[in-house]
Regions:
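Extracytoplasmic catalytic/substrate-binding loops of multi-pass membrane glycan-assembly enzymes
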Residues: 37-51, 60-72, 80-84, 304, ...
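Short acidic/glycine- and proline-prone juxtamembrane loop motifs at membrane-interface regions
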Residues: 129-139, 178
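Loop-to-helix entry region of an early transmembrane alpha helix in multi-pass inner-membrane enzymes
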Residues: 67-71, 79-99, 130
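Transmembrane-helix motifs of polytopic, lipid-linked glycan transferases
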Residues: 88-108, 142, 146, 150
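Membrane-interface alpha helices of multi-pass inner-membrane proteins
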Residues: 164-179, 207-214
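Membrane-proximal stem/loop segments at transmembrane-domain junctions that anchor or position
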Residues: 226-359
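Specific aromatic-rich, kink-prone transmembrane helix
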Residues: 56, 139-157, 167-172, 188-189, ...
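Membrane-interface anchor segments at the N-terminal boundary of transmembrane helices
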Residues: 81-85, 89, 323-415
């Protein structure tokens, strides 16, 4: 967590930096430790319940999760049969990543910004709740943002340090492979490798290739599959949307999908179930639930190939209004946290349905669990303000705009990566889950430094821009 170039600082300054990082780490450890003690072993949710149940049955691939997350779960919960063994290392990683960024900001003498990010981002009840749960979204989102932060620092100095190499190696697998949309992080990693000199470039390549090969090999050996991906759920969910019965029964709306699409879909779900089981906010009713009535899991490769072809050649274009409305609805329902939520005390009842060595509240704390529930519920009632990802989204747009105006390639790559992530979430989400947008709640940790804390900058020459606009006074900083 500490800068790599501490030896080059004066003695008093070195002590100041050490104190800042230690204090930040201790505050975060205290906050996360108290929270986890009150929710031990952590909220399960439907995904956590499925993960534990399938690992217990030696069938983790049927969770539909990505191989990297399943490998981690097998190496922790699978070997110990304890949920806390899975959660605690992730909590420590989150504390370390947050202390790294917030401490860096404080060292640059922005105490108000650092304190605001500590209180309004790092230690908010919903972040603590997701961070201690069996969902990979919190650690994935934070790792994604923290890895972009490290890339930004390295690009500012055009060199790798021991600390930066360690951070890249630690954060990369979670940021890239814990969820399918993490693959986007390969773009800034590739850009970083190109911008660095030969030796450093090969270090980046080695980190990417070694982790990628290890996860691919582990997933193959453990027969973990490839998850359900993003395209299949989208096509099935939206095709069901397009096939909803229209009460007006207008002539113009009688052929909203191809005859072949109707034939394929009706092999696996009846029209009555298409009308009754479709939920505009969730695809769970078509996949995870009602498997006696919806047999999409049994769909043959040939049928899905034909369905995919019809979707992109006719069905999508015939239903642009319905598709756009569906995308906007799910995105806004997610951003406003109007979907399902897992409370802090979820494990109280969730553990009863699975076989595990973990127990709820093993410390027999009497008031802390109830207090945390009350804090969480109060925060939830103000979620439209306190949980809003729109601050991060606005900052992404501001940084992207400035990068275009100043033709600053480094910032353009960083902000474009987040915009691609946002576009992917908008286009491919099939459930109104707030956790999908957690990366943009974390985004101010990265974007406030980029937007407001000057870093060594080397903008591309722009003949149309005044020199004073594209050149800034550098501030000495260490990665």
């Amino acid at each position: 967590m500490m800068p790599s170039s501490l030896p080059r600082q004066g003695g008093a300054e070195r002590l100041r930096i050490i104190r800042i990082y230690l204090c930040t780490t201790l505050i975060l450890l205290l906050a996360y430790g108290i929270w986890y003690a009150g929710v031990w072993p952590g909220p399960l949710g439907q995904d956590g319940y499925s993960l534990i149940a399938n690992i217990n049955q030696s069938a983790p691939r049927y969770t539909g999760k990505d191989p990297a997350w399943l490998l981690y779960a097998l190496a922790t919960y699978g070997l110990s049969q304890r949920v806390e063994v899975l959660v605690l290392p992730l909590l420590l990683l989150q504390v370390a990543a947050l202390a790294r960024i917030i401490g860096w900001i404080y060292v640059r003498r922005y105490p108000i910004t650092a304190t605001a990010l500590l209180l309004l981002v790092a230690c908010t009840p919903h972040v603590l709740n997701y961070g201690s749960s069996l969902y990979p979204d919190a650690v994935f989102s934070l790792a994604f943002v923290a890895l972009l932060f490290e890339i930004w620092l390295i690009l500012g100095h055009r060199r790798l340090s021991t600390w930066s190499i360690a951070w890249l190696a630690i954060l990369f697998p979670a940021a890239c492979y814990f969820k399918a949309n993490g693959i986007i992080i390969l773009l800034p990693m590739l850009y970083l490798a190109i911008r660095l000199k030969t030796t450093s470039r090969w270090v980046i390549v080695a980190i990417v290739l070694s982790w990628s090969a290890a996860i691919q090999w582990g997933g193959t050996v453990a027969n973990l599959g490839h998850g359900h991906g993003a395209l299949r759920p989208l096509i099935l969910f939206e095709t069901t949307n397009f096939m909803q019965t229209r009460p007006m029964n207008l002539w113009e709306t009688r052929h909203m999908v191809t005859d072949r699409t109707k034939e394929i879909m009706h092999r696996y779900i009846s029209q009555e179930d298409i009308d009754s089981l479709y939920d505009r906010d969730y695809w769970d009713t078509l996949w995870h639930l009602n498997q006696d009535r919806v047999r999409f899991r049994e769909m043959s490769r040939i049928d899905f190939r034909h369905l995919r072809s019809d979707f992109f050649t006719y069905n999508l274009w015939r239903n642009i209004p319905a598709f756009t409305a569906s995308r906007i609805n799910i995105f806004l329902a997610s951003a406003l946290a109007q979907g399902g939520m897992v409370g802090p005390d979820n494990a109280r009842h969730g553990l009863a349905g699975v076989t595990t060595l973990s127990t709820y509240n093993p410390f027999n704390l009497s008031s802390l669990p109830n207090t945390l529930n009350e804090i969480y519920e109060t925060s939830y009632n103000w979620r439209f303000v306190l949980w809003s990802p729109f601050v991060g989204i606005i900052l992404v747009l501001l940084v992207f705009k400035r990068a275009l105006q100043e033709r600053h390639l480094d910032e353009l790559v960083i902000s474009s990566t987040l915009l691609l992530q946002l576009g992917g979430i908008f286009l491919f989400s099939i459930a109104a889950e707030y956790r999908y947008l957690l990366a943009f709640f974390y985004a101010p940790l990265l974007l406030f430094p980029i937007r407001f804390i000057q870093q060594n900058r080397d903008p591309l020459p722009c003949q149309k821009c005044p020199r004073s606009r594209s050149t800034r006074q550098p501030v000495t900083s260490t990665p």
